[in-house]
């Protein structure tokens, strides 16, 4: 058990103060078009105050069309950046690493935001259509842009969530 409390060093040299990681939990606390709310900010920072060495965000869509739930934290728009800077400043002051989980809801997207559901192939059960080559290229670019945005907002790492094809 004591191993959990020991420092964790990643292959790139980055160190976490312990091996406790907050898993990505979507709790729909950021209803203002993806901007981090005070509730979500407090919820995440309280975990760092409680001793977690690594805090991972909820799944954040890389495109507005990738929103899966109302109140989902976003990273797809520059207007989201201020909240991410503020969050990371606080997490780092609490000696916690921060990881941004980025995704697209795909066949589970909320059609109120996306207009339709897309996937790598037709999914009649989820009423999803097959993505075009152009949409695949747009998606790849969106993941790259959001990974760069996360890095610029001082996240220590990125996790790619790709379960909703």
Question: Can you annotate each of these PLM segments?
Answer:
Residues 44, 88, 147, 155-158:
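Generic hydrophobic/aromatic pocket-lining and core-packing "Φ" positions
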């Amino acid at each position: 058990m004591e191993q959990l409390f020991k420092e964790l060093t990643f292959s790139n040299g980055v160190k976490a103060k312990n091996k406790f990681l907050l898993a990505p939990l979507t709790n729909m606390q950021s209803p203002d078009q993806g901007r981090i709310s005070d509730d979500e900010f407090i919820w995440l920072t309280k975990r760092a105050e409680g001793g977690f060495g690594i805090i991972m965000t909820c799944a954040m869509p890389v495109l507005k069309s990738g929103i899966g739930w109302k109140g989902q934290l976003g990273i797809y728009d520059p207007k989201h950046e201020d909240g991410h800077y503020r969050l990371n400043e606080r997490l780092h002051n609490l000696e916690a690493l921060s990881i941004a989980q980025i995704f697209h809801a795909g066949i589970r997207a909320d059609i109120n935001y996306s207009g339709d559901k897309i996937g790598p192939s037709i999914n009649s059960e989820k009423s999803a259509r097959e993505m075009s080559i152009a949409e695949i290229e747009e998606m790849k670019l969106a993941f790259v842009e959001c990974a760069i945005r996360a890095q610029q907002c001082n996240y220590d790492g990125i996790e790619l969530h790709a379960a909703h094809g």
